[in-house]
Amino acid sequence: MKVFMGFDPGTKGFVSMIAEDGSFIKAEPIFRDIKVVDMIETANRLLAFVEGYEVRHVVIEDVHALYGSSAKGTFTFGYNSCVPEFFCAIAGLPYTKIP
C-alpha cells in the first residue's frame, strides 16, 4: 500500500501515516519514553512502523526551540527534532521539512 508519513517532532513527538486517498492509517509517539531516548530502540520502532508499506513521501515539521528556553532544554529539543530527518536518510525515504 502506498502511503505518506508525517512527523511532528515537538515536545512529545508523533509520527502518523495516511493512505494515498488521505484516509488515516495509524499514528504513534516517536519515542517510547521522551525522557530516556534510546536511538536504537527508536530506529527499530520506526522501521517497524513503515514495514509492509511503500512510503511515497514524508513531511517533517521544521520546529524550533522557544525563546527563553534553557540551554539544556534547547539542546535536548534540537537533538530529538533531528531524529525524523536521520530516520528518513537512513531508510532512504524522500522528505520535506515545512514550517
Predicted segments, located by residue:
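Phosphate- and other anionic-substrate recognition elements at nucleic-acid/protein interfaces
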Residues: 1-99
